[in-house]
Amino acid sequence: MSMFCYQCQETAGCKGCTVKGVCGKDESVAKAQDLLIYVTKGLAVVSNEGMKVGVKDSKVNKYIVENLFTTITNANFDRDSILDRVRETLRIREDLKAKVVKAGGKVGEVKVSGGFFKKLFGIAKEEMVGPDAATWTADNVIEFDAKAEKVGVLSTENEDIRSLRELITYGLKGLSAYMKHAMNLKYDDETVHEFMAKALAATLDDSLSVDQLVALALEAGKFGVNGMALLDKANTETYGNPEITTVDIGVRKNPGILISGHDLRDLEMLLEQTEGTGVDVYTHGEMLAGQYYPKFKKYKNFAGNYGNAWWKQKEEFEKFNGPIVMTTNCIVIPKASYKNRLFTTGATGMPGCPHIEAKADGTKDFSEVIKMAKKCSAPTEIEKGQIVGGFAHNQVIALADKVVAAVKSGAIKRFFVMAGCDGRANSRNYYTEFAEKLPKDTVILTAGCAKYKYNKLNLGDIGGIPRVLDAGQCNDSYSLVVIALKLQEVFRLKSVNELPISYNIAWYEQKAVIVLLSLLHLGVKNIHLGPTLPAFLSPNVAKVLVDNFGIGGITNVEDDMKMFMQG
């Protein structure tokens, strides 16, 4: 069986990648990821059973989170490291299974079948109780490859069951990213891990109906909110509340290190280790949000933001001249001209690129990156100017009186939530045109790399309130929810859907999936997704979302604008 992957928006023909991923992963990597997800579900089954008999293990939680994160689009292209995780997952599963059985649990228990006389004459058959994912084991690549052929997405034959299982799995992948970042800052929530194990195990349960899986997907949204709230708490208590910040997009004269991705702990360690070295640190992509946190502003070598969204990195990384640190997705297969300057860490991986491992205490040594930077030229300037951001919930609520007054006076007629992701497709230019053509009495609320489609346009302000309010990274979509709920409270409305807010969201990968499920859990309706609806939504599952939540796609700027402005 050839590879099959349809987890991202750019999947081939909006149906599925079957020869090579549009992301760049080949068939061997795709199948290694399939196998890793399969054995992770098996580990979740054992973990779920363990909870029933009081057996819990934080190491298991951590590994489930990291495995899921590793398979997010554009995170890890290193087949060997993925298969190493498969081996370690099997080992951890068997260790946990022994503890569960000792405590009275049933999973993985050996049962002898065949009747009394077959047992007597030694010809009975031994069988393992539990899903195959919880009992299958192997120790070599040949067996891994053979198993991977059988456990991919298409191994679930029923289209609707498959769709819902993948919707849940992709939501959990997104949630895993947020949990991992929070855990890196020593914040955690056991209830989220318990749900993740339960939900992963449920995707192996053939007895569950479509209705039960729909309910589970919405429950994933509940824990998505909890996960984003936890990460918001971790980030703000560690680094302070984001504040209105003007960020340079030009360059300085010193050599630099470019840090991309989402992990603020990695950013902190890099700033600590580069201080006083003569090496500047620039943010890239969604790491732009690091510029908004007060704690990072004390570092004099913390320069501005270099470049744009992830998909432009081949051109921009080449011109940066110095080393690049990828803390999370999104990585694009690098050009030879800068591949030796690309470092991965955390869940990321790229064959031929050095990987920086965390020590037992979670710290990382960036000395090799700094050493390389000192030998490199300063970044080539690709643009000049400044952008403004830092409008997370605490900052916007501090401006609440001003915002409310603008709404009451009619100066602000409508808010547009245009959070989400950017991508390669030309069809995404829709979002630039949409932002440009919005009436001057509207305000864009954004988070994630979707902002790069319009955050450098001169869209002006309304009474001193910028018309683009950037809350930060994709996880900071939580801030947009908090802002909406606060406005609902201020205006004394029964539902958040009564607010003059429209949702025109660009999605790309699995973190956007958990954001969507979180919004649905909160009761937000009439969300429009683009540039295409997810390929993993079967017609019947899509109909459920349309009928119950008003989910829709996009068409063209003119028609969509009229539809949104009508409320």
From Swiss-Prot:
Q: Write down the required cofactor(s).
A: [4Fe-4S] cluster; hybrid [4Fe-2O-2S] cluster
Q: Which gene encodes it?
A: hcp2
Could you tell me the keywords of this UniProt record?
A: 4Fe-4S, Cytoplasm, Iron, Iron-sulfur, Metal-binding, Oxidoreductase
Q: One GO biological process from the UniProt record?
A: response to hydrogen peroxide
SUPFAM superfamilies according to UniProt? Prismane protein-like
Q: Which CDD domains match?
A: HCP
Where does this polypeptide localize? Cytoplasm
Q: State which Enzyme Commission number(s) the record gives.
A: 1.7.99.1
Record lineage: Bacteria, Bacillati, Bacillota, Clostridia, Eubacteriales
Key word Iron present? yes
State the HAMAP family in the record. Answer: Hydroxylam_reduct
Instruction: Give me the comment on cofactor binding.
Output: Binds 1 [4Fe-4S] cluster.
The entry's family comment says:
Belongs to the HCP family.
Q: Which PANTHER family match?
A: HYDROXYLAMINE REDUCTASE
Indicate where the modification Cysteine persulfide is found in the sequence: C421
Q: What is this protein called?
A: Hydroxylamine reductase 2
